[in-house]
Design a protein with these regions (language model features):
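Charged, amphipathic alpha-helical linker segments immediately N-terminal to NTP-binding catalytic cores
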Residues: 1-25
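Membrane-targeting and insertion segments and their boundary/processing signals
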Residues: 4, 27-30, 34, 54-58
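Long amphipathic alpha-helical scaffold segments
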Residues: 24-44
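Globular "head" domains of long coiled-coil molecular machines
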Residues: 8-15, 38-246
């Protein structure tokens, strides 16, 4: 029996259960929960990619998708929560739905997404108003089963990119604090998470992973995967693999 057969059986069982309680006192208490479970069965698995700044999250997202979509670089690039999912956008020129914090939505281009990355004053002013960006892709087989979430890095250090303007630094810290909480929230509510390390685990890594474990949303060793990135740049990292298992 394959996965589709099992899913169909569970879906039908939920249907039968909903029909059974339709005319009972249980209806008001359980009908919405049953419908929610059916919706989850039909939805793709949500896989969040998290990790410290410059750990290689966007490189991994591009590798999983098989195309260069997520912007990458040697400095911090992902400054927004970027979601890649199955779907047909209204136009090829503007395939990304930008959801603002005030609830406003607007279709934007890939160039607009790229303009949000980094820590310049202009980028900070734009990203400060954005909740998330959703890129719809219709011809990628992976997205039939998985919705990928590229999250902002955690543990950023202001000044790494030559930023010395106090107002910009304060804005960066405020935005980073919100994005770090967004990353924790998204990772806690995702079906699975890939966490990237590129060095011996730090307190930042440990605290973040502890927040997932204690979050009560089901991220465990079964659906949480740790990935040691950039080992080709420093093969001695492999010798320290025991540090990652503690």
């Amino acid at each position: 029996m394959d996965k589709k057969d099992i899913t169909a059986q569970i879906y039908n069982l939920l249907d039968e259960t909903a029909a059974y309680i339709e005319h009972t006192t249980w209806r008001n208490k359980y009908s919405l929960a049953l419908k929610s479970l059916q919706d989850e069965l039909k939805a793709p698995c949500v896989l969040a990619v998290a990790g410290k700044v410059k750990a290689g999250k966007s490189f991994l997202v591009n590798a999983l998708l098989g195309v260069d979509i997520a912007m990458t670089g040697t400095t911090e690039t992902t400054a927004t929560v970027n979601i890649f999912k199955k779907g047909i956008p209204p136009s090829k020129e503007k395939p990304i739905l930008c959801v603002f914090l005030d609830g406003h939505k607007e279709w934007v281009s890939k160039q607009y997404l790229d303009s949000l990355q980094g820590t310049s004053k202009e980028s900070l002013e734009r990203t400060d108003k954005i909740d998330r960006l959703i890129m719809y892709i219709n011809d990628n087989p992976l997205l039939d089963y998985v919705t990928l979430v590229d999250t902002p890095g955690i543990g950023a250090e202001v000044g790494e990119d030559g930023d010395s303007h106090q107002i910009q630094t304060d804005a960066y810290f405020n935005l980073r604090e919100r994005h770090q909480q967004d990353t924790i929230n998204l990772s806690n509510t995702a079906d699975a998470i890939i966490y990237l390390f590129n060095t011996v685990p730090t307190e930042t890594d440990k605290n973040f992973l502890a927040s997932l474990y204690n979050g009560g949303h089901g991220i465990t060793s079964l659906n949480g995967i740790g990935v040691l990135s950039k080992v080709d740049k420093d093969l001695t990292q492999i010798e320290n693999i025991s540090h990652f298992c503690k």
